[in-house]
Amino acid sequence: MCGIVGAVAQRDITPILIEGLKRLEYRGYDSCGVALYMDGHLRRTRSTKRVAELSEQVAEDKLGGFTGIAHTRWATHGIPATYNAHPHFSAQGKDEPRIALVHNGIIENHEELRQELQGVGYVFESQTDTEVIAHLVNHLYAGDLFEAVQQAVRRLQGAYAIAVFCRDEPHRVVGARQGSPLVVGLGQNENFLASDALALAGTTDQIIYLEDGDVVDLQLARVWIVDQAGKQVERKAHTVQVHTGAAELGPYRHFMQKEIFEQPRAVGDTLQDIESITPELFGDGAYKVFKEIDSLLILACGTSYYAGLTAKYWIESIARIPVAVEIASEYRYRDSVPNPNALVVTISQSGETADTLAALKHARSLGMQHTLTVCNVATSAMVRECELAYITRAGVEIGVASTKAFTTQLTALFLLTLALAQTRGRLTEEQEAEHLKALRHLPAAIGAVLALEPQIMAWADRFASKENALFLGRGMHYPIALEGALKLKEISYIHAEAYPAGELKHGPLALVTEHMPVVTIAPKDALLEKLKSNMQEVRARGGELYVFADADSKIANAEGMHVIRMPEYYGALSPIVHTIPLQLLSYHTACVRGTDVDKPRNLAKSVTVE
């Protein structure tokens, strides 16, 4: 979602701030801005356009300085407008602005604080909760910005990551985090803040990941961190190699297309040359944990939730362990019955998804002790919070609509299935060898499906004029149908729904007409004949079927039946393979419709607020 960059240096940091914002554009935003200390004054430029336009405006305004902050905003409180864009200034009365501040998150008690600050003379120029923090810091300021921020955050309820600097202390930037990510970048006589280490790629590779409750004081030659209790703490610096090429398109039209075609590499890297199935793939002590548990509780949001639904089919059928899958944002508010013997599994691309983190903490508060995360970021809060972890190696995903993160999550969850089965004595050596062979061939199988792109592009031309679509799947392919429908609605803005094919007669069939494309996933599995009957129900009502069928499924093109043949049936891993054509269909449909594929309206990449 929102992005933060800040710096204190002995050189002009304007290019660093702007470049950092460009690297954070993938998170989604509707406005942006930068503020700097210049010649004894606070100066800023804000825009509701793209960062490229902001950069041009900054050059026109001749902004430059050695201390500053920058921000990309995804609107929560207040409409997307320049006056709501960050950074926000604070001054009392007619005084010159003294405080500049940017903020990610949601302050739940902002109305109460706003009224209090208005009562002592502060005038608000925006609708945001962020301006409340700026005025609060200014109100508490008595010559020491670090102390003022510590006092201010004690008054805040909700989630936040903030960066702030003061006109009266020009060589200092202060940051704080609670429930929203913030990192420190270390330099030589210069230091940096960002909401994502990617923003600092090419500037520094020495990164400190702040913990919840931390407040950090950045000066030229010093970084000082205190925890929630105000006690000075040391946080380990990590050497982080972020490849700037991840933020470059190369020969591709969009990042989503690039990331779709990176999936053979991403899945191969996630498998990391695994020679055998062992619980220790998920961390030290995993064998003991896997022996103790009697069930799994999977917590996730969005696309990651669909990965969890797929894993439920695998784990219950192969490892024979009961699995519950919960939408994280619902689970934490439901009066559920906890099972202390369950393994809580969280799934998150970023490892910072606010709802999933909150659900994880809620599960632990109910006495559920064993936790595992499947995550793409090794240094994320999710990994730090969990007992066990499997790090996918998808690489940085820029497009808002998840592609390679999803397939690598599925790959990791299948490995988890096999490790659980082995621990329970339900995986023979022959079965292990067979599954490992299939996994090693998976990148090539994905590559073969990517070769179907020209055929899928022809379908996209037909889909582009539609306003509704239906996706059907059965068994372990039903979650893949859900994911396909989500992708289409996310980036093409076509309303799409997914159903188990067996549920057609229980309502969705009423929607089927010649104007409703029906996308069907038709692998050659035990449910194929049942699925064929469901497809005939659609044809009988004049519906147009678009079928991804395995080569030997004996489903042929006919009137009202359009078929693309998948290269091969891939057994238990078929859901991963069948994901790929649905991604391509959504992508090319969106291209024909002319939408902003990488930055769809109203959506953000990393959802770090509840």
Swiss-Prot record:
Residues 286-426, 459-600 form the SIS domain. Its main location: cytoplasm. It catalyses: D-fructose 6-phosphate + L-glutamine = D-glucosamine 6-phosphate + L-glutamate. Residues 2-221 form the Glutamine amidotransferase type-2 domain. Its EC number is 2.6.1.16. One of its GO terms (cellular component) is cytosol. PROSITE patterns: GATASE_TYPE_2 (PS51278), SIS (PS51464). It is found in: Cytoplasm. Coiled coil: none annotated. GO terms for molecular function: carbohydrate derivative binding; glutamine-fructose-6-phosphate transaminase (isomerizing) activity. SUPFAM superfamilies: N-terminal nucleophile aminohydrolases (Ntn hydrolases) (SSF56235), SIS domain (SSF53697). Pfam families: GATase_6, SIS. InterPro entries: GATase_2_dom, GFAT, GFAT_N, GlmS/AgaS_SIS, GlmS/FrlB_SIS, Ntn_hydrolases_N, SIS_dom, SIS_dom_sf. The active site is at C2, K605. Transmembrane segments: none annotated. Keywords: Aminotransferase, Cytoplasm, Glutamine amidotransferase, Repeat, Transferase. One of its GO terms (biological process) is carbohydrate metabolic process. It is an enzyme of class 2 (transferase). Homodimer. Catalyzes the first step in hexosamine metabolism, converting fructose-6P into glucosamine-6P using glutamine as a nitrogen source. This is Glutamine--fructose-6-phosphate aminotransferase [isomerizing]. It comes from Bordetella parapertussis (strain 12822 / ATCC BAA-587 / NCTC 13253). The gene is glmS.
